[in-house]
Curated annotation (Swiss-Prot):
Pathway(s): Pyrimidine metabolism; UMP biosynthesis via de novo pathway; (S)-dihydroorotate from bicarbonate: step 3/3
Cofactor binding comment, as recorded: Binds 2 Zn(2+) ions per subunit.
Domain of life the protein comes from: Bacteria
Organism listed in the record: Clostridium botulinum (strain Eklund 17B / Type B)
Gene: pyrC
GO molecular function, one term: dihydroorotase activity
Protein name as it appears in the record: Dihydroorotase
EC identifiers of the protein: 3.5.2.3
Record-listed substrate binding positions: H60, F61, R62, N92, N256, H287, P297, G298
A Pfam family the protein falls into: Amidohydro_1
Gene Ontology biological process terms, A to Z: 'de novo' UMP biosynthetic process; purine nucleobase catabolic process
Active-site residues per Swiss-Prot or TrEMBL entry: D283
Cofactor: Zn(2+)
Amino-acid positions noted as binding Zn(2+) 2 in the UniProt annotation, renumbered to this chain: D151, H178, H215
Amino acid sequence: MELLIKNARIIDAIQDFKGDIYIKDGVINEIAQEIKKDNVEVLNCEEKILMPAFIDTHAHFRDPGLTCKEDLESGSKAALRGGYTGVCLMANTKPICSSKEVVQYVRDKSKELDLIDIHQCISVTQNFDGKTLDHLNEFKDDNEVKAISDDGVGVSNSNIMLEAMKIAKENNWVLMSHAESPEFSKSDMRIAENMMTIRDVELAKLSGAHVHMCHVSTKEALKCIIAAKDEGANITLEVTPHHIGLTKEINDYRVNPPIREKEDVEEIIKAIKMGNVDTIGTDHAPHTLEEKSKGSPGMVGLETAFPICYTKLVRENGVSLNELSKLMSLNPARLLGMNKGRISIGVEADLVLIDIDKKIKVDSNEFVSKGRNTPFEGMEYYGEVLATIKSGKIKYKK
């Protein structure tokens, strides 16, 4: 399989130049200002932006068990339409991903579909019971496991969380923290996030584990995490497109953690500009319209992430496309131990072609995700994904 990409503006975390890319056997084989090859498939970019495909550090595909909301195929196709070729899936499936059987189902189905790379999180506690860690022993020799998380509920018992962090460190896993203190969940969601953030940061320092703080949304939590990172703690910091693109004044859509105040959004953008944020994760969380009408928290995000982030960060706040690529591609690849997220000879050819000058209007009827739950309906942003390439094959083309 050969593909020649012509006339692209090539951008990754450190590069920005015009040129061609030749892909052979799924890998970037040659990069130059001009490449000529006979009898190969050609993609003419017409000077549009070509970036490393995005990798989502935080998504929910609801498969197995909740496939009325999403499944591995629909979620993967939504990812491709949004420019993503890799996702890290949370464990809140049905049954919860606490067993080898569930993990193997996801892996086998993913390979059968052959659409994107899927990394399935293991639950921190068995079946989210908040106390049992024995199931983690099953995965100690499984090199495909990258991360563990009780995302959606969190781990309220501090001793259990510390022990889980120690296990994660022993196995070189990332522990993904959903920072929410249950004591405050019903009364004050700001305090709920802040209190649990403080605890998990301190436990991360104590254990030495790599702790990934998911969907950080308050200015206080940001300050706490950044201070710990500055001290050398092995912590990475994730924010979402909706916590960048919305404030309570614009749309108080139900999501967990909630849409925050203007000052919180300003601090998130400031942290990004200062280089203190590591990844952008969509927290793609599809629901049926019936469930959403009853108050289920969450929104779909894979198909709108880039235009929201590009518009809000690059166009409106002066963040470079290089930095955005770092947040959406390079750093997520590093987090998950993937040889991706950059444009270099010998790297797997996962790429996305984007028209950054094209204005789009969000229309949930055009989503390929089963989910239609979005607060961005009818809003306009810049940046349209034209094509997504996975291992040198064009998997999505508008």
